[in-house]
Every structure is written in C-alpha cells, then in structure tokens.
Amino acid sequence: MAKSPAARKGXPPVAVAVTAALALLIALLSPGVAQAAGLTATVTKESSWDNGYSASVTVRNDTSSTVSQWEVVLTLPGGTTVAQVWNAQHTSSGNSHTFTGVSWNSTIPPGGTASSGFIASGSGEPTHCTINGAPCDEGSEPGGPGGPGTPSPDPGTQPGTGTPVERYGKVQVCGTQLCDEHGNPVQLRGMSTHGIQWFDHCLTDSSLDALAYDWKADIIRLSMYIQEDGYETNPRGFTDRMHQLIDMATARGLYVIVDWHILTPGDPHYNLDRAKTFFAEIAQRHASKTNVLYEIANEPNGVSWASIKSYAEEVIPVIRQRDPDSVIIVGTRGWSSLGVSEGSGPAEIAANPVNASNIMYAFHFYAASHRDNYLNALREASELFPVFVTEFGTETYTGDGANDFQMADRYIDLMAERKIGWTKWNYSDDFRSGAVFQPGTCASGGPWSGSSLKASGQWVRSKLQS
C-alpha cells in the first residue's frame, strides 16, 4: 500500500560480491584469569569480504556478583580500523580500540552476557585483547589454544545459536504455521527493502551486515517493482541484481523473500508472462538454497479472489518444476489485506484456497490506518490458514504520516502469540516516515543505527533485538 517516492529514479547499480559467512574465535580469557575474574570476552568473525569483516563481541559474567561496567580493548594491525560499532561506546588511540558498555548492556548479572559488535575496514584481525584490564590471551600463544586465531565451534552445531538459517534450516508449512526443518513452529522477523529501482544504494555489505548482526533480523524481503521504472524496463538487469542480493543475504545466514512487487495495475494477470519468466530463472538458480521464499504477487487490488487464485495456480507450477519444496507466499485481495480493504475477509480464502501445498497467504497493514477490523481479520486468518505479514508499517497506508506505535504493538503482540512472521516496510532512507533511515544515510554509507534512525527505525530495531 505504500506509495513510490516522488524522486530517485534509475537502474540498479552493480553489486559488490561477498564471500560466505565465516566464524572465528578471536579472543577468550585464559583459564587462570577466568578463575580470578570470572569475566570472559569472545570476539567472533561473522562475515568477511574483500576489504573488511564484521564481528560480534560477547562479554560473559561467570562470577556470583553483578558486573557494573565492562571494557574490551582490541589491538588491530596497521591498515585495519573500526568503521562502525553497535551496542557499545568506541574510542581509539593508534591501533588500540576500546569498547565499553552502553546504558542498556553495561551491567551484567551473574551468568549473564552483553553483546556488541563492529565492522572492520581492512582484513587484519585483532592481535591482542583485554577484558577489564586482564589480557585475553594470557598463557596462550597468538593463534594457539584460547588465543587470537582459534576457530570457534560451528554455530550450527549448537542449538539456539548461529545464523537464523543455521538455527531453523529449510522452513516449511505445517498446518496453519511456518515451521523449522524439524516441524517446530517458528516466527521469522525482519525488514522489507523499498523498491530496488530507487533505493538499491541502501543495500550494501555494511547495511546488510548491520541488519543481520546488529538489528538481529531473521529475514529480508527484496522488493522488486514490476512497473514504476522497475523490472519491465530492464528484465535482465533487475533479475541479475536479485540474484546478487539473494546471494548477499544468504552469505549472512538470512532468509530471503523474493517479492514480485505488483501494485499498479493491481491485476496480477497483467504481468503473468513476466512472472513466469522471472520465477523460472530465480527458482532454477536458487533451488539448492535452504533460505529462499517466493512472494508471487505483492498487493493484488481491484480484482476478485478467484482471479488471484487462478494467477497463483499458473505461477506456482513454474516454481515447483525447479524448486519443489520451498515456501511460496500468495498475495490476497484488497492490497493483501485478506480482502478487508475491499469489503471481504479471510473466509473467502478459506472457502476457496489455492490448489497447492507448502504455501502461505500474505497480509499487509499500516497501523495508523488499519484498526481493529484488520487486526481481527489477521487473528481470524491465523486460525484458518498459514499467514505471513510480508509488509507493514507503523504509519498510514501511504507509507508516510504520524506513527501509531500503540496500535503497532498490538499487532506485534498478536504476531508473537501466533508465531506469524513479519517484515516491516522499509529498509531505506526515503523521506517518508515509514523508511527507517534519515534521508542521506545510504549515500553516506551509514551509520545504520543511532541518530541515523527515524522513530520507526528505532522502534523496529528494538523489536528485532528483543
């Protein structure tokens, strides 16, 4: 329902390739120090690329007393600097970089942890580490046991740890819910991009690192408009860019919704042939991945549910021929309002479901516009069939205007209760209130937190981190 921006036109720029995500234990307090202080610091390399890497910093308090403040000091080799930090205060002097707790994580109770992280510019890894003045590598040779360079255990082998894809595996529909590879209901939460024809420059290595490692998202929705200077103007260019973005998200362990963003015209049949061509190639290329979901019609409008259903039953087989077991999300009547915006509701879908398996139905809402009747429709639908909220905002349906966080919290609570996945609109610096970043943030390369965030950005980041 959100509108296109009044400015910012143009074709997608070339993407920067990224490497697969890595994990590396940089520093751990030595056993002797741990017995004396009981405070450990672990730095884990989460992802790397040609000119840098991102890392998380975890401080653990294994004492019987509360730690009121912590300080981690890392020494980086010449040519490597800290470009961005989250959940910590950062100062530097020469090659020494000091990270201290902020208001919400400086105090650590017994048995508790505090997490932060940074993005390094340059490939050099820490050569020395201290936690509250005690050397992290005391008693260990650099690169030896417990010292810098020691690989950490594979996160995927530890229940509840690792990237979202490592935790949940290939998701599937089970009954009325989305489940992990073991059949346990799971809620995936994350962000939707804006149209990549306008805001592709907001999707960079550093912004996606922030989304994955600082914001703690599980999933990203890649929104590719078909009209409005979108796919129809350059099918090859937009398809190639979607391949790149899928790979970039995959490298960070994120799930991906490939969003065929129809809006105007609202009849999905208008773009049927284009959809078949696009999804045939996307499914063929990415069928072996465990993290890709397909959203085949963003916001159908002005057409009946029967028409939307017939469209879905033509596109789904194209995907299934190439990718037989990934989740497919079908847009619903009335701008994916489950029909509410056009005087209907979930019952029409339940009475005439799409003839396909492992599918879900999309619901979109904008909290300042869509009140209790929409909330009740979501509640009703979640009892009838699988629903994924692939787009929502705290503002009005225009993507702009005042935020209604109180109403948005009611939706968030229901979605948490029913384990309904969601992606918020939108991860860009559009001038409208629905965009999470202040205008100019993307062109400046961040930062992707703090003063760069609008109110809606602060709100959703806190939801994802909780």
Curated annotation (Swiss-Prot):
Annotated signal peptide: 1-36
Keywords, ordered alphabetically: Carbohydrate metabolism, Cellulose degradation, Glycosidase, Hydrolase, Polysaccharide degradation, Signal
GO BP term, example: cellulose catabolic process
Family matches, as Gene3D superfamilies: 2.60.40.290, Glycosidases (3.20.20.80)
UniProt keyword annotation of Hydrolase present: yes
Pfam families in alphabetical order: CBM_2, Cellulase
Sequence ranges assigned to domain CBM2 in this UniProt record: 37-139
Region (Disordered): 129-166
E.C. code: 3.2.1.4
InterPro entries registered for this protein in UniProt: CBD2 (IPR001919), CBM2/CBM3_carb-bd_dom_sf (IPR008965), CBM2_carb-bd_dom_sf (IPR012291), Glyco_hydro_5 (IPR001547), Glyco_hydro_5_CS (IPR018087), Glycoside_hydrolase_SF (IPR017853)
Catalysis: reaction(s): Endohydrolysis of (1->4)-beta-D-glucosidic linkages in cellulose, lichenin and cereal beta-D-glucans
Enzyme class, UniProt record, top EC level: hydrolase
PANTHER family: ENDO-BETA-1,4-GLUCANASE A (PTHR34142), GLYCOSIDE HYDROLASE FAMILY 5 DOMAIN-CONTAINING PROTEIN (PTHR34142:SF1)
Family from the record: Belongs to the glycosyl hydrolase 5 (cellulase A) family.
Protein name: Endoglucanase E-5
